């Protein structure tokens, strides 16, 4: 177990940005009631501070970094093996981009427990040792406002620098984070980029988001599927990073989709576990998709939606063979 105390944290630099954060902290953590976020503070950051205060926490508290025991850690990692396999290559590429700046990368589950650590680590620095450990709890409930807790709570990418952390003991850290969604749209965890006493690099939020999307795409492609639809608006790139992906199984049911595909093709509300056929999303027969994948897998297809909007798509065959029994049933229905 590691703990950091406020007196271990040095004052932040006296530039205008840090002075603005300092003024915001005095307003939020003082006795003055605020109806909304103070000037210069993002609404999501103010909400996180408010949640910490509502939980009875104080900024000057000692921060304890609790970790799972060996048995619980083994169970947690075993339960996320597919996520780990998808994330490790992407994290290695990420570290190649930021390692020279002394940033490292963390992968957590949906509760904020660290599953994987990659990058250059100063093992003699207790501030690095405290967080760069598999099994440590970095949730908002555990360690206050961080990119990890905020990304999970807000379901979006964040950047957090020094004194923007709730606890004064955490003001050495700078971190970017983005949530990770599974092929069914559920939150699986988040990807974090953290440095200790490093220059501010808010652009890392975009890198974290890009890498999180790459992990989601790897998870989707690993699903058994008969067709993979690459989706975009007309004129947008296809077959490249940053596109929508929709996987369809051998019977024409949606096996999964990435975040962009769920935005391009909104899915109707349905009961958990209830299959959703692609014909409920796309205003064209499933048989037409199968034929296009067989005959013209590298040729874009105009894809009508029931809303009247149109997308363009590449429809490519997957490793799973199409069920011809279901295909004939759709041809005659």
Language model: regions and residue ranges:
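PAS-family sensory domains
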Residues: 44, 54, 114-149, 207-209, ...
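Regulatory sensory and allosteric helical modules in signal-transduction proteins
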Residues: 66-100, 104-105, 109-163
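A short beta-strand signature within small-molecule sensing/ligand-binding domains used
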Residues: 170-178, 309-313
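Sensor-regulatory modules in signal-transduction proteins
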Residues: 180-182, 305, 318-320
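Short beta-strand-to-loop transition segments that serve as allosteric relay/switch motifs
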Residues: 190-199, 318-319
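Amphipathic alpha-helical "output/dimerization" segments
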Residues: 202-214
